[in-house]
């Protein structure tokens, strides 16, 4: 869903910002295939006052990174073009943004209210993150865990045994669903239609510094535990 992608992209935005951040996720949150961090960074659009941009090319770029073109912006992940005005609701922002052009030059940037369409606040720049986790043109996915530096990251694992059990259940359900889709004639070649096996994620986790919180059982198959 768009809301789920929004939450994940907010997490990605926080990680890419370079500032210390705490991310809360589940083990299966590491199992999804995402575009590599470098690819997401390349597709982030930064627009400033006085930037020189062609509106039609801008609209095409927004479509390429997952934004839906509409007659009027009503929710996150949408954009609209009216004359020399570009309205866009960035997935990671609280309010939509109206960008007015003078020819090919950005004349003004301001947030606005969806209901009243009235301006809220002038801005000097806006950073627009993709509206999809796997933009067009990507062929190989990575885990969200790969976004984190091993040198600067500590993983806190709450009840590792339960985390692994949940991940295994998710994997089994996913594989069963994929099997049924194949039986019904669907093609499953897209990278985003895959997940990483739990075993692979556990191997990745073992390469990071981590602290586990166990209620009872101190052993967890696949995880290296040191007391």
Each language-model region and where it sits:
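ASCE RecA-like P-loop NTPase motor cores
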Residues: 1-227
């Amino acid at each position: 869903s768009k809301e789920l992608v929004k939450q994940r992209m907010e997490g990605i935005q926080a990680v890419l910002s370079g500032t210390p951040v705490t991310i809360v996720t589940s083990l299966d949150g590491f199992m999804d295939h995402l575009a590599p961090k470098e690819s997401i960074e390349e597709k982030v659009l930064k627009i400033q006052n006085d930037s020189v941009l062609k509106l039609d090319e801008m609209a095409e770029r927004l479509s390429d990174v997952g934004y839906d073109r509409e007659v009027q912006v009503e929710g996150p992940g949408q954009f609209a073009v009216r004359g020399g005005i570009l309205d866009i609701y960035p997935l990671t922002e609280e309010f939509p943004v109206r960008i007015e052009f003078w020819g090919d030059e950005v004349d003004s940037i301001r947030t606005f209210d969806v209901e009243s369409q009235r301006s809220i606040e002038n801005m000097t720049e806006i950073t627009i993150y993709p509206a999809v986790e796997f933009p067009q043109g990507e062929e190989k996915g990575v885990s969200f865990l790969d976004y984190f530096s091993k040198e600067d990251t500590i993983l806190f694992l709450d009840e590792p045994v339960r985390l692994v059990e949940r991940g295994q259940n998710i994997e089994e359900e996913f594989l069963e669903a994929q099997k049924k889709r194949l039986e019904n004639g669907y093609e499953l070649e897209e990278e985003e239609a895959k997940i990483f096996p739990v075993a692979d994620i556990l191997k990745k986790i073992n390469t990071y510094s981590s602290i586990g919180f166990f209620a009872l059982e101190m052993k967890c198959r696949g995880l290296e535990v040191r007391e």
